[in-house]
């Protein structure tokens, strides 16, 4: 149902007002069999309870000088509320209440006096007077300004003089400087001599001796032509293996060194790589300052022949040992440069290896250890080459046996 239909079906307000005025006589109103005694019944002196002696405080009452009709409110519609309800007095059987006042032992709280009088600032406390600078003491002049002269006209661009050292405190002796510790001498200057009596400390001459001139050596290159810097290429070896092979030692026809797979790789046009100047590889745990020698081993049916190049070595500085358990030949010693001490100080290029050397060569193949006569080993040093001969007791007859699974 729409709102318009509801408005059409709802009875008008005049109908409801007529029903209220007529009461039970209205045709649409039916009397209740048991009427409510507490129901509000509009009457001049009734509040809603039958027999109440006081008028209702909520009923509209006329104002002073207003002639409105309380029944139908013909003039105006009681725009102002009713006057406040007067106190009816105590209930029946109760005496009127009277304020007893303050008890005799407790006087009323007096109003503070300081709030009645205007507040005035008392000033600082007696023990807290405002500070007044008395000025400098009689025996102490004021601190002068470092930038202004005494007459106040000429400025000074320098600060005041430093405060002098007052000396040690009371009860303390002056600390004498004992000097340098006997076991810790002052570090000498490398640019001045130790003699402090002369006046040549300002010359700046070095106290350490001058080293002989050595041209710069580019790492990992060789000598090309007669001029330029002499580039050095030390040989790189792998310990425990023999160098060379079917191609032999030295330089090949295409211009690069014939090396095995254990050597440092080289460029095919003869220019070695930069990392070819690394020190020889040593296994972990093997630390020795002696360098490895290049050896040639010849295996003949009668003996093993080993050639070791030792240029500049002497017989008394070379030692050859034989280990029968490991079937290993050991060669060690030292190689030095001939000449006087003064000549060795003037060296300008050192490409030859000198110093201690050590090399161990294991004889035989992987099949079995060869049978050699350790008492008949001979060695000789001729033309800078050490020749060691190890004779065999039996010819090599190694047979390969087939194992049946």
Swiss-Prot record:
Keywords recorded for this protein, A-Z: Stress response
Q: Which Pfam families match?
A: HSP20 (PF00011)
The biased composition feature labelled Basic and acidic residues covers: 63-77
Q: What is this protein called?
A: SHSP domain-containing protein AacuJ
Q: What is this protein for, i.e. what is its function?
A: SHSP domain-containing protein; part of the gene cluster that mediates the biosynthesis of the tetrahydroxanthone dimer secalonic acid D. The pathway begins with the synthesis of atrochrysone thioester by the polyketide synthase AacuL. The atrochrysone carboxyl ACP thioesterase AacuM then breaks the thioester bond and releases the atrochrysone carboxylic acid from AacuL. Atrochrysone carboxylic acid is decarboxylated by the decarboxylase AacuI, and oxidized by the anthrone oxygenase AacuG to yield emodin. Emodin is then reduced to emodin hydroquinone by a yet unidentified oxidoreductase.
Q: Where is this chain compositionally biased, Pro residues type?
A: 175-189
**KW Transferase (keyword) present:** no
> To which protein family does this belong?
Belongs to the small heat shock protein (HSP20) family.
């Amino acid at each position: 149902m729409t709102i318009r239909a509801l408005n059409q079906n709802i009875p008008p307000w005049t109908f409801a007002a007529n029903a209220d005025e007529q009461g039970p006589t209205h045709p649409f109103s039916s009397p209740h069999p048991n009427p409510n005694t507490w129901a509000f019944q509009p009457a001049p002196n009734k509040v809603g309870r039958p027999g109440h002696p006081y008028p209702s405080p909520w009923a509209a009452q006329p104002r002073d000088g207003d002639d409105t009709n309380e029944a139908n409110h013909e003039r105006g519609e009681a725009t102002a509320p009713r006057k406040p309800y007067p106190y009816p007095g105590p209930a029946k059987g109760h005496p009127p209440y009277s304020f007893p006042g303050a008890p005799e032992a407790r006087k009323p709280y007096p109003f503070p006096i300081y709030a009645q009088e205007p507040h005035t600032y008392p000033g600082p406390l007696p023990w807290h007077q405002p500070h007044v600078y008395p000025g400098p003491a009689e025996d102490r002049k004021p601190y002068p300004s470092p930038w202004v002269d005494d007459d106040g006209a000429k400025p000074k661009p320098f600060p005041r003089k430093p405060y002098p050292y007052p000396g040690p405190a009371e009860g303390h002796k002056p600390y004498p400087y004992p000097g340098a510790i006997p076991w810790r001498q002052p570090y000498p200057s490398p640019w001045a001599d130790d003699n402090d009596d002369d006046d040549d400390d300002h010359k700046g001459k070095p106290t350490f001796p001058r080293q002989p001139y050595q041209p710069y050596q580019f790492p990992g290159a060789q000598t090309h032509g007669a001029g330029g810097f002499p580039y050095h290429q030390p040989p790189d070896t792998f310990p425990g293996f023999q160098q060379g092979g079917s191609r032999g030692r030295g330089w090949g026809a295409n211009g690069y060194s014939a090396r095995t797979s254990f050597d440092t790789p080289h460029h095919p046009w003869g220019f070695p790589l930069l990392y070819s100047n690394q020190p020889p590889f040593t296994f972990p745990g093997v630390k020795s300052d002696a360098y490895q020698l290049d050896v040639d081993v010849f295996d003949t049916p009668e003996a093993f022949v080993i050639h070791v190049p030792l240029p500049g070595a002497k017989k008394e500085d070379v030692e050859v040992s034989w280990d029968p358990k490991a079937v290993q030949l050991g060669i060690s010693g030292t190689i030095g440069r001939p000449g006087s001490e003064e000549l060795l100080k003037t060296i300008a290029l050192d490409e030859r290896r000198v110093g201690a050397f050590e090399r161990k060569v294991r004889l035989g193949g992987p099949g079995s250890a060869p049978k050699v006569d350790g008492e008949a080993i001979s060695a000789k040093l001729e033309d800078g080459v050490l020749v060691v001969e190890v004779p065999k007791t039996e010819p090599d007859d190694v047979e390969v046996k087939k194992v049946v699974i």
